C-alpha cells in the first residue's frame, strides 16, 4: 500500500506547528511500519483534523484501514486523496488493492493501470497489477507487468525470480530459466533462484543439471531445506533411491524432527513398494509438523486405496495448503471435494493443478465438470475441448462434454459426444447413463430405460443410473418389482446421506418415493448447500439491507423470480397478481430467468408489473443478484424451487432481507437462505413444521391460486343440449360455452331453464339448497345441426349469426385462444362423443401426468370402478407409452380394457374445458393434481382427494377446503373409495355436489385473484413488520383474512 506522508501541504501556521505536524507524521509512519495500526490511526486522525486536505495523511489512513481489513474506509480515504490530487498514482493503486481484496478484479486492474499511466515508473504499481492479473487468469498480462517493473529497475532479483516462477507455470521454461539466470547474475548467492533453476532443468528432463543446481542451492544455503527435498525428489525421479535416501537423511541431520524430510523419505519407501513402512513414515511426518506436499499426497493415495477417505482428505488438504504445485495432489483432492459437494474448493484445486501442468487432461476434464455445475458452460466447454485435444481417446471428457452441451440445449452435440464416448469405450457405463438422460429429457422414455439398464449391467453399483431408471419406470407406470425397487432406492439415499454425498434422487422427485420426512428435507438441504458452493466462488461480500421503507416512498418492494413467465402452468396460475397489487403500498418487480417466449402470458406480466427485468440476459449470478439488490427489494419470492430453469444461486447470495418460497415448487427448499414458505394450514399443518427448513407463512384460505376466471371466463356459464336418460337432464354430455352464450341462447326458441338444487356451502351436501339455472336446448333442428357438426368433424358453423365451433378445433380457429392467451370468441361445443366417452356411464377422470399414479392408487381406482358397474376411468396419454402398462395392471386387477379410456394431451383451453364432461375427478394421493386440480374444479367437476404426508399430497385438500367442499376429502383409502362410489351411484347426491362445486368456484375465494392478492399483501406486510422490528424469521400461522372490499 502507498502510505507516504511526505510533501506536506504549505501552511501559514508557525514553523513550530509545522515541526510538530511533521514529527507526528513521522511517528505515525513508524507505527504503521511496525504494525501498530491502532496508534498510527490515532495519530493520523490528529493530523487529518489539522490538515484535512493533506494527501500524505490521506494515503496513510487509506493504508492503515486496508491493513485492518476496513476496505470501505480505505477506499474512502483514497477517494479523498484523489479529490485533492487527481494525478496521485498511489491513491489509485490503493483503490486497486481494495477492489482486488473484494474480488472485483477488473476494477482493481483498471485502477492499477490508471496509476501507472499517471506514474509510469511506479514499480509497486506494476507488482500489484501483476498479482491482480494472475488472480484474473491473465498470465500474459502479469508477465508484461513484471517485465515493465524490471525495465525501470533491472536489479530487482526477487521480482525477476517471481517472473521466472510465472513463466515456469505457463510452461515457458526457457524464459523462466533466463529469469533465474539473470537473478543469479544480479545476486549470485540467491539460493532460491538456484533451486528454481534446478526445478526448470528437472522439468526439461535435465536430471543431472537439476541435481547440480539443487546441490549449489544447498551449498549457498546449508539450511535450505526445500533444496534438499528437491534434490531427493529429482534423485527419486531418476530412481536413484539410495542417493535419494541419502539426501533426505542429510536433511534429517540438519533437522531430525522435520516432517518434510520424513515425508519425502516415506515417498521413497512407497516407490519401493514398502507401503506399510511408507504409511508409518508418513504418519510420523504428520505427527511432527506437515511441510511437504508430496508426502501428504502419497499418504493420501495410500490411505484412499485402503478406504480411509477422511484421512486421505486431510493429507490432500495439507498438501494444498502448503504447496499448490503438486498437480496429482491437487487433482485427487479436488475429486474428493467434488464427491463431497464442495464445489468451490474443487475448482480452486483443479485450476492450481492446471497452472502447474497445463497439459493435464484429467484436470481439464474434471475442472470442466465442476464449471458446468456452476453454470459456467462456455468455460467448461473450453476445458473439455482442451482435454480432448491433449488426449483424443479420452472417453470421460467426451461424455462430460456431452453433459455440458446438453445443458446448453445442444441436444445433437450431446448425442454425438455420448455416442463417441461409447465408441471409444463400449463398456463406459457413465456414457450410457448420460445418453439415457438425453432420451429421458426428450420424452423418449423407452430408449432412456434401455440405456439406463445397459449402464447398470456394466456398473451394477451405479446410484444415479438406478434412481433415474426408477424415475423413468415411474413415468411410464412400469411397476415390475415395485416394492423391491422402492426399498433399494431408499437404501441408496440413506447411504448417500450418511456419507454426505449429493443424493441421486432429485428434490422434486423425492415426493414420489417412500422416503422419510427427514430424508426428503436432507435431499433438499444438499441441493441448497450446492447452491451455496456455487456462489462462494464469487467471493461477494454480504449485502446490506434496508430496515425501513423511506427509500421506496413507503411502498414495499416485492420481487417475483421465475423462469416461467410465459406459457407455463405457473403463469397460468398467477399472471394477474403483479397487476393486482395495491400500487400505493407495493412496488412490484418481476425477474424473468428465461427469454421472452412471445406469448401473451409474458406480455401481460411485463405490462402489469411495475418493473420487468429479464435476468436471462445476465447469466452471471453475482451480477444478477447485484441488480436485484440495487432495486432495493424488500421481499424476494422464489417461484422455481428446484424445478427446471431455477437459479437458486441468486437467493443464496441473499440480495433481499426477506426471501420466501411460493407457488411454483411443492416442497421445502432445505436452504438456509430461504426464510419463509408461503403455504396454508391444510397444506402444511403446524405440527409438521419440522419438515420445512423455512418458517411457515400461512395464507388464510389456500396458498394456491388460479387465474382461471380471467383466462377462461367463457366457462363461467354453460348450456346443455337435452340428453335424457331415466328422466335426468345431464349437464355434461353436450355442453356449450362462450362469452356470448346468453345472447346466443336469447336468439333461440324453446330454450328451457332447469333449476338444479345445490348446497349453499360448507362441508355437508345436505345443507340448505340454492337453485341454479341450467339452460337446456331441446332436441330440435338447431341441436341437430350442432350434433351433426360434431359427428362430421366440421370446424365451425353459423347459427343466427353466431359462430358455433367444434371443441376439438380451437387450435385451427384461434391458436392463442387454444393456449389460453386469449378468450375464445365463438360458442364452443364439447361432447363426450369427441373423446369416445360413453354417454350413459359415470365418467371418473384424472388428468395428471401418469407418474403420479402408483400401484396402490390404481388399485383404489379399480376398486371404485368395480363397485360402480356402469363407470369408466378417463386418463391422459401423459405419456402415451404408459397406456399399455396401466391397461395391463388394470386387467390384472380384474378390469376389462374398455373400462379405462385414454385421450391425448390437449391445448390448455381444451384441457380445462373438456373437464366438464367428467362426472368426478379422482385425485392422485401420491402427488395431487395442483394446477390440474384447479383446472378440473373450474370446469365444475368434483374432485375426491386423500391428503398424505407431503406438501405435494395435500394441495388438493387445501383447494377443496377453500372451495367449501370438505365432504370430498377422505381420511383414508376406504373413505376415498366410499366417497367416489357414493358419487357414482347416488345420482341425486352427484347432482348436488356438482352444483355445489359449480357455484362455489365463483363465490368462494379459490379463484378470486383480487382477494388472494390482498391476502398475500397482508402476509408480506406481516413479514416486513416482523423483520423491521429486528426479529428473525418466525412462523406466521395466524393469517389475517381480508375481503375484496377491504
Curated annotation (Swiss-Prot):
Residues recorded with modification Phosphothreonine: 454
Subcellular location: Nucleus; Cytoplasm
Residues with the N-acetylalanine modification: 2
Motif (Nuclear localization signal): 487-503
Catalytic site positions: 508
Database matches in PANTHER family: UDP-N-ACETYLGLUCOSAMINE--PEPTIDE N-ACETYLGLUCOSAMINYLTRANSFERASE 110 KDA SUBUNIT (PTHR44366:SF1)
Designated name of the protein: UDP-N-acetylglucosamine--peptide N-acetylglucosaminyltransferase 110 kDa subunit
Amino acid at each position: 500500500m502507498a502510505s507516504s506522508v511526505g510533501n506536506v501541504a504549505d501552511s501559514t501556521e508557525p514553523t513550530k506547528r509545522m515541526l510538530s505536524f511533521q514529527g507526528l507524521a513521522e511517528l505515525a509512519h513508524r507505527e504503521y511500519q511496525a504494525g501498530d495500526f491502532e496508534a498510527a490511526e490515532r495519530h493520523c486522525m490528529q493530523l487529518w483534523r489539522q490538515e484535512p486536505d493533506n494527501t500524505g495523511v490521506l494515503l496513510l489512513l487509506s493504508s492503515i484501514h486496508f491493513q485492518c481489513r476496513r476496505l470501505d474506509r480505505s477506499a474512502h480515504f483514497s477517494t479523498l486523496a484523489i479529490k485533492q490530487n487527481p494525478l496521485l498514482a498511489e491513491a489509485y493503486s490503493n483503490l486497486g488493492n481494495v477492489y482486488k481484496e473484494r474480488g472485483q478484479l477488473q476494477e482493481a486492474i483498471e485502477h492499477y493501470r490508471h496509476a501507472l499511466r499517471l506514474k509510469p515508473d511506479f514499480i509497486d504499481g506494476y507488482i500489484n497489477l501483476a498479482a491482480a492479473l494472475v488472480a484474473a487468469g491473465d498470465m500474459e498480462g502479469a508477465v508484461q507487468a513484471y517485465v515493465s517493473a524490471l525495465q525501470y529497475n533491472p536489479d530487482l532479483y526477487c521480482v525477476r525470480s517471481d517472473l521466472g516462477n510465472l513463466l515456469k507455470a505457463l510452461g515457458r521454461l526457457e524464459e523462466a530459466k533466463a529469469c533465474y539466470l539473470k537473478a543469479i547474475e544480479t545476486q549470485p548467492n540467491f539460493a532460491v533462484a538456484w533451486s528454481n533453476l534446478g526445478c526448470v532443468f528437472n522439468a526439461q528432463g535435465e536430471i543431472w543439471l537439476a541435481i547440480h543446481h539443487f546441490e549449489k542451492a544447498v551449498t549457498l544455503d546449508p539450511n535450505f531445506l526445500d533444496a534438499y527435498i528437491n534434490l531427493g525428489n529429482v534423485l527419486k525421479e531418476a530412481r536413484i533411491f539410495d542417493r535419494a535416501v541419502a539426501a533426505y537423511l542429510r536433511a534429517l541431520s540438519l533437522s531430525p524432527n522435520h516432517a518434510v524430510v520424513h515425508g519425502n523419505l516415506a515417498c521413497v519407501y512407497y516407490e519401493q513398494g514398502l507401503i506399510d513402512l511408507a504409511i508409518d513414515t508418513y504418519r510420523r511426518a504428520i505427527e511432527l509438523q506437515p511441510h511437504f506436499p508430496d508426502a501428504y499426497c502419497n499418504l493420501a493415495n495410500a490411505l484412499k486405496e485402503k478406504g480411509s477417505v477422511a484421512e486421505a482428505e486431510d493429507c490432500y488438504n495439507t498438501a494444498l495448503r502448503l504447496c499448490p504445485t503438486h498437480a496429482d495432489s491437487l487433482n485427487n483432492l479436488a475429486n474428493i471435494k467434488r464427491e463431497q459437494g464442495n464445489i468451490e474448493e474443487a475448482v480452486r484445486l483443479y485450476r492450481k493443478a492446471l497452472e502447474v501442468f497445463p497439459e493435464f487432461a484429467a484436470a481439464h476434464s474434471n475442472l470442466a465438470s465442476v464449471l458446468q455445475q456452476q453454470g459456467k458452460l462456455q468455460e467448461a466447454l473450453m476445458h473439455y475441448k482442451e482435454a480432448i485435444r491433449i488426449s483424443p481417446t479420452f472417453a470421460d471428457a467426451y461424455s462430460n462434454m456431452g453433459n455440458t452441451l446438453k445443458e446448453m440445449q445442444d441436444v445433437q452435440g450431446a448425442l454425438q459426444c455420448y455416442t463417441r464416448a461409447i465408441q471409444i469405450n463400449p463398456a463406459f457405463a457413465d456414457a450410457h447413463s448420460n445418453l439415457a438422460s438425453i432420451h429421458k429429457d426428450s420424452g423418449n422414455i423407452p430408449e432412456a430405460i434401455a440405456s439406463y439398464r445397459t449402464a447398470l449391467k456394466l456398473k451394477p453399483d451405479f446410484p444415479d443410473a438406478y434412481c433415474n431408471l426408477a424415475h423413468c419406470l415411474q413415468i411410464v407406470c412400469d411397476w415390475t418389482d415395485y416394492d423391491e425397487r422402492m426399498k433399494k432406492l431408499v437404501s441408496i439415499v440413506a447411504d448417500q446421506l450418511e456419507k454426505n454425498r449429493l443424493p441421486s434422487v432429485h428434490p422434486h422427485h423425492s415426493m414420489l418415493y417412500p422416503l422419510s420426512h427427514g430424508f426428503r428435507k436432507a435431499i433438499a438441504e444438499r441441493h441448497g448447500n450446492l447452491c451455496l458452493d456455487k456462489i462462494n466462488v464469487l467471493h461477494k461480500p454480504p449485502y446490506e439491507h434496508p430496515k425501513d421503507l423511506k427509500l421506496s416512498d413507503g411502498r414495499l418492494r416485492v420481487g417475483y423470480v421465475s423462469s416461467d413467465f410465459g406459457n407455463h402452468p405457473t403463469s397460468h396460475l398467477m399472471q394477474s397478481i403483479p397487476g393486482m397489487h395495491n400500487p400505493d403500498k407495493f412496488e412490484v418487480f418481476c425477474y424473468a430467468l428465461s427469454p421472452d417466449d412471445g406469448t401473451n402470458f409474458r406480455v401481460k406480466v411485463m405490462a402489469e408489473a411495475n418493473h420487468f427485468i429479464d435476468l436471462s440476459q445476465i447469466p452471471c449470478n453475482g451480477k444478477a443478484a447485484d441488480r436485484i439488490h440495487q432495486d432495493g427489494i424488500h421481499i424476494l419470492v422464489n417461484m422455481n424451487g428446484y424445478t427446471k430453469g431455477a437459479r437458486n444461486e441468486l437467493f443464496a447470495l441473499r440480495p433481499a432481507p426477506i426471501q420466501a418460497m411460493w407457488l411454483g415448487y411443492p416442497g421445502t427448499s432445505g436452504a438456509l437462505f430461504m426464510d419463509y414458505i408461503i403455504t396454508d394450514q391444510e397444506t402444511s399443518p403446524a405440527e409438521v413444521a419440522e419438515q420445512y427448513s423455512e418458517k411457515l407463512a400461512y395464507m388464510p384460505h389456500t396458498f394456491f391460486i388460479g387465474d382461471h376466471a380471467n383466462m377462461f371466463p367463457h366457462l363461467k356459464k354453460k348450456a346443455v343440449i337435452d340428453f335424457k336418460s331415466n328422466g335426468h337432464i345431464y349437464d355434461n354430455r353436450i355442453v356449450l360455452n362462450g362469452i356470448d352464450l346468453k345472447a346466443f341462447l336469447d336468439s333461440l326458441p324453446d330454450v328451457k331453464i332447469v333449476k338444479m338444487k345445490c348446497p349453499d356451502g360448507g362441508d355437508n351436501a345436505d345443507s340448505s339448497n340454492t337453485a341454479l339455472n341450467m339452460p337446456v336446448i331441446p332436441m330440435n333442428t338447431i341441436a341437430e345441426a350442432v350434433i351433426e357438426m360434431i359427428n362430421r368433424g366440421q370446424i365451425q358453423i353459423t347459427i343466427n349469426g353466431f359462430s358455433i365451433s367444434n371443441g376439438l378445433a380451437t387450435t385451427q380457429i384461434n391458436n392463442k385462444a387454444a393456449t389460453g392467451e386469449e378468450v375464445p370468441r365463438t360458442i364452443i361445443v364439447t361432447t363426450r362423443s369427441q373423446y369416445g366417452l360413453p354417454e350413459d356411464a359415470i365418467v371418473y377422470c384424472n388428468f395428471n401426468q401418469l407418474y403420479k399414479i402408483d400401484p396402490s392408487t390404481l388399485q383404489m381406482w379399480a376398486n371404485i370402478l368395480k363397485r360402480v358397474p356402469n363407470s369408466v376411468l378417463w386418463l391422459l396419454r401423459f405419456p402415451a407409452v404408459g397406456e399399455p402398462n396401466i391397461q395391463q395392471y388394470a386387467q390384472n386387477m380384474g378390469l376389462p380394457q374398455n373400462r379405462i379410456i385414454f385421450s391425448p394431451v390437449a391445448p390448455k383451453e381444451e384441457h380445462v374445458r373438456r373437464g366438464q364432461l367428467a362426472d368426478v375427478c379422482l385425485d392422485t394421493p401420491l402427488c395431487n393434481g395442483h394446477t390440474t386440480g384447479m383446472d378440473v374444479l373450474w370446469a365444475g367437476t368434483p374432485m375426491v382427494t386423500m391428503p398424505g404426508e407431503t406438501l405435494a399430497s395435500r394441495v388438493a385438500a387445501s383447494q377443496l377446503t377453500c372451495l367449501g367442499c370438505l365432504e370430498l376429502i377422505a381420511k383414508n383409502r376406504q373413505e376415498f373409495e366410499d366417497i367416489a362410489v357414493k358419487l357414482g351411484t347416488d345420482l341425486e347426491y352427484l347432482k348436488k355436489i356438482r352444483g355445489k362445486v359449480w357455484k362455489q368456484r365463483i363465490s368462494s375465494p379459490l379463484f378470486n385473484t383480487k382477494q388472494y392478492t390482498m391476502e398475500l399483501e397482508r402476509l408480506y406486510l406481516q413479514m416486513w413488520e416482523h423483520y423491521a422490528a429486528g426479529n428473525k424469521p418466525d412462523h406466521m400461522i395466524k393469517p389475517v383474512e381480508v375481503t375484496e372490499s377491504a
